[in-house]
Design a protein with these regions (language model features):
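Serine-dependent protease modules
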Residues: 2-177
């Protein structure tokens, strides 16, 4: 797409066109008015500490130890997914659909240790499940207050979308209305 092609579109021909600013030209801070977000349950990693934003690389390094793989056995097959360490004493959060219908569930830590998990509870509507493994000294993710999030806030997600086959992936985006 080029600027010269804008003239070919009547609706855009009379508009003022300017390139988007590059990163160095962006303001250091952007304010977005709070928008209604509904009353659903949300689980988030804590907001960045005051004093500046972290790079995606820093966020990754600070949180990758808290990301685990989930393996569930279902009849002749397996269910694979991601979990997040919630506490030092072995509580893990995952998606309910990952463990739904599984006879046994294993949690694989970043250091390759495998633990059989007990289901503490799950809620299909919010698609959340809490598991417990017999392991102490884990590195939990830092969870924050989701009521502090605003539309437009930057977020990042780290996970193992295919269990152990595709580990440690990361994506970023924004909170949308």
């Amino acid at each position: 797409w080029s600027h010269s092609r804008l003239e070919e579109l009547p609706a855009l021909a009379d508009s003022t066109w300017q390139p988007l600013p590059v990163r160095e030209e962006l303001p250091e801070e952007t304010t977005v008015e709070r928008a209604p977000t509904g009353d659903g349950t949300t689980l988030t990693i804590s907001p960045l500490p005051s004093g500046g934003a972290h790079s995606l690389q820093e966020i990754y390094r600070e949180n990758i130890a808290s990301i685990v793989s989930i393996r569930g056995s279902k009849g002749d097959g397996m269910s694979l997914g991601t979990g997040v360490v919630m506490s030092e004493d072995g509580y893990i959060i995952t998606n309910s659909h990952v463990i739904e219908g599984c006879g046994a569930v294993d949690v694989v830590l970043q250091d390759e240790r495998v633990f059989q998990a007990l289901l503490v509870g799950q809620d299909a509507q919010s698609d959340l499940a809490v598991l417990k493994i017999d392991c102490a000294g884990l590195t939990p993710a830092q969870f924050g207050d989701s009521t502090l999030l605003e539309v437009g806030d930057a977020v990042a997600a780290i996970g193992n979308p295919l269990g152990e086959e595709l580990r440690g992936t990361m994506t970023d985006g924004i909170i949308s209305a």
